[in-house]
């Protein structure tokens, strides 16, 4: 539908913004100056310190970025959850003493660092700034609900179609989810009805959700 296509185009645009201007390939940000082992992800963190900053489309670090510029930052600790496994990452704001950055994409780099990509919307944001985090909690909670729904859907598919059903891919966003799975034949209308019934019954049961790692 229209809303989905608009959201998809926003993600595509941001992905393009995070590509190298010269090669068109995803930017491999130069993190050699950072102590990667000291970086932390703490979803309860209220803020952190900017350890590195880049133009969104350039691998080489800079000291600061001004209003209107596309930027990418790494902080010593971050509360922003990176995208992964088909699930979108957190969005929100990074508030610096002299500026604000709107975070539109959060990714995990190949070296393990979490990087926040977006636009400086006010003033100047610089390396060394002590910053505060403002995560879009409503959006994050919507994504969490849809993440849980993929587990319910997977369990229901196994119950209706058989234990051979395995996840083959997924998309988890704030307004919808997609669950790809393996099966040897098309799902019938009756099987689909049963899957929907099982999932809806579990949702209506409003059971507590626990996280295990």
Mark where each language-model region is:
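A glycine- and charged-residue-rich anion-binding loop/surface
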Residues: 1-213
């Amino acid at each position: 539908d229209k809303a989905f296509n608009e959201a998809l185009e926003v993600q595509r645009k941001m992905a393009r913004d995070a590509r190298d201007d010269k090669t068109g390939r995803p930017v491999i940000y130069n993190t050699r100056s950072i102590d990667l082992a000291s970086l932390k992800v703490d979803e309860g963190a209220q803020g952190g310190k900017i350890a590195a900053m880049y133009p969104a489309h350039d691998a080489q670090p800079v000291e600061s970025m001004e209003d209107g510029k596309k930027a990418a930052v790494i902080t010593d600790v971050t509360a922003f959850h990176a995208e992964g496994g088909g699930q979108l990452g957190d969005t929100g704001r990074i508030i610096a003493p002299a500026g604000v950055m709107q975070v539109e994409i959060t990714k995990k780099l190949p070296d393990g660092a979490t990087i926040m990509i977006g636009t400086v919307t006010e003033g100047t944001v610089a390396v060394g700034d002590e910053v505060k985090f403002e995560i879009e909690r409503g959006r994050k909670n919507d994504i969490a609900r849809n993440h849980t729904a993929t587990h319910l859907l997977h369990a229901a598919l196994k119950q209706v179609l058989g234990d051979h059903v395995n996840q083959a891919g997924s998309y988890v966003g704030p307004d919808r989810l997609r669950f790809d799975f393996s099966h040897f034949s098309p799902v019938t209308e009756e099987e689909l009805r049963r899957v929907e019934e099982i999932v809806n019954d579990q949702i209506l049961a409003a059971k507590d959700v626990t996280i295990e790692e």
